[in-house]
Amino acid sequence: MSSADWMAWIGRTEQVEDDICLAQAIAAAATLEPPSGAPTADSPLPPLWHWFYFLPRAPQSQLSSDGHPQRGGFIPPIPYPRRMFAGARIRFHHPLRIGQPARREGVIRNITQKSGRSGPLAFVTVGYQIYQHEMLCIEEEQDIVYREPGAPVPAPTPVELPPVHDAITRTVVPDPRLLFRFSALTFNAHRIHYDRPYAQHEEGYPGLVVHGPLVAVLLMELARHHTSRPIVGFSFRSQAPLFDLAPFRLLARPNGDRIDLEAQGPDGATALSATVELGG
């Protein structure tokens, strides 16, 4: 299938219904350990926790060798084998209520092809709207990048990170238990997150890869527990992978009506940057 054929997927839609069940929210709280503790029935779902719902549940026989569902259907069958959730832009209009049903409507908004250091790249922009009782609660755009295999990724060289005086910080130890639990929360069978020999020998990573959405959620958790204002928007961009080889640092810098967020690898480089927008 040529890139021209992929364009036929623009405008394709899907609709998924799910219960914002309490058990899944409790499992998320057990994994993330928010200071506020586990949520209760009919309480508002914390921001970004909607990523733990509306999950693709491909049958086992329809998984690719890397653990991803085979492409086609809603997502175009782009042949490049490497996939990355590269970024997102989200508006929070109303909180989802735990214990109540919801509906997510998706649409393929754009597909573009570019060239990078590893060869051709395909960018797929997916739009989502989440409704509960016919009220629009969340709007989201996700950027998914597909690429050819590249050169092996070297392990970052740890350095002593300088102290930061203008930010709230947290150090995260990304051990395999955390990565496994997050994969379970998101029903994500991609082997780079739990199968070390596969991650190293098949995809060329130095260790298990930390999920980009996990880093984004951890940054959101840091931000939301250091503000009393409502969170109305969030955006993030992945810049470099993180691995389970060493701790990484989260930083949150309040800046007027927003909070600037950053995840730094053990080498001090920015792995993911994000922004929280605050309401009145």
Swiss-Prot record:
Family to which this protein belongs: Belongs to the HTD2 family.
Molecular function as annotated in GO: (3R)-hydroxyacyl-[acyl-carrier-protein] dehydratase activity
Regulation: Inhibited by 3-methylfumaryl-CoA concentrations above 0.3 mM.
Catalysed reactions, as listed in the record: (3S)-citramalyl-CoA = 3-methylfumaryl-CoA + H2O
Keyword hit for Lyase: yes
GO terms under biological process: carbon fixation
First-level EC class: lyase
UniProt keyword terms in alphabetical order: Carbon dioxide fixation, Lyase
Subunit-level organization: Homodimer.
Native source organism of the sequence: Chloroflexus aurantiacus (strain ATCC 29366 / DSM 635 / J-10-fl)
Keyword Lyase: yes
Role: Involved in the glyoxylate assimilation cycle used to regenerate acetyl-CoA and produce pyruvate as universal precursor for biosynthesis. Catalyzes the hydration of 3-methylfumaryl-CoA (mesaconyl-C4-CoA) to (3S)-citramalyl-CoA.
InterPro entries noted in UniProt: HotDog_dom_sf (IPR029069), Mitochondrial_HTD2 (IPR052741)
Name assigned to this protein: Mesaconyl-C(4)-CoA hydratase
EC number annotated for this UniProt entry: 4.2.1.153
